[in-house]
């Protein structure tokens, strides 16, 4: 079995794979101040609850966009698992050809998503990840990572609205029947949800055109991340949701580098 960790700005997602099957996964809050032992205690509890043992784990791979947390996580893995983890970054084989001006600028999470999507779908792709930031990535059928777009995420955009507009209440992000709303709460909800759905459709439309102008077939659009389901219900562009895309990518990269 292998342990995979996707370290994001808001959450750390952990998964356990037995062969190619995801048998358990959890989500922890990202906290730069936690020590290796504090993370170790959390992982012990998660393993215990699922009747898993640290000795079952043969390898570990980590993808992170939070450099400050890596010392604690690597130390935790070393101390509790006695394993040196694979860290997604320069020198790690991914099978993806990064066409960015500076490939080192591409976030590990975006690379991992590209690896998974290419492995699963084998076609031109637009990958949308609704995380702390919302990212759009263009990948060709030949596994060339062309680039993409980064937008403020739904939660941080909403938080900024609530923090800066004193009279606007915080609201639950749920769909409204339409956009002509009769109260402030519904007006905010519709603005956020339909606004982001429109953003998705517009960016995907432009990205598809640019990819097809390069000779690609019409790209398949896959979405992942916490708000993927909510936005996909209103977006006309998303073909499929894959909630474990990043974990799958980590598994594939581990297999390429073990």
Swiss-Prot record:
Organism expressing this protein natively: Clostridium botulinum (strain Hall / ATCC 3502 / NCTC 13319 / Type A)
HAMAP family per the UniProt record, alphabetical: Pantothen_kinase_3
Reactions catalysed: (R)-pantothenate + ATP = (R)-4'-phosphopantothenate + ADP + H(+)
Binding locations of K(+): 129
E.C. designation(s): 2.7.1.33
Function of the protein: Catalyzes the phosphorylation of pantothenate (Pan), the first step in CoA biosynthesis.
Family membership: Belongs to the type III pantothenate kinase family.
Name of the protein in its database record: Type III pantothenate kinase
Keyword Kinase: yes
Residues given in the record as substrate binding sites: 100, 107-110, 184
Keywords: ATP-binding, Coenzyme A biosynthesis, Cytoplasm, Kinase, Metal-binding, Nucleotide-binding, Potassium, Transferase
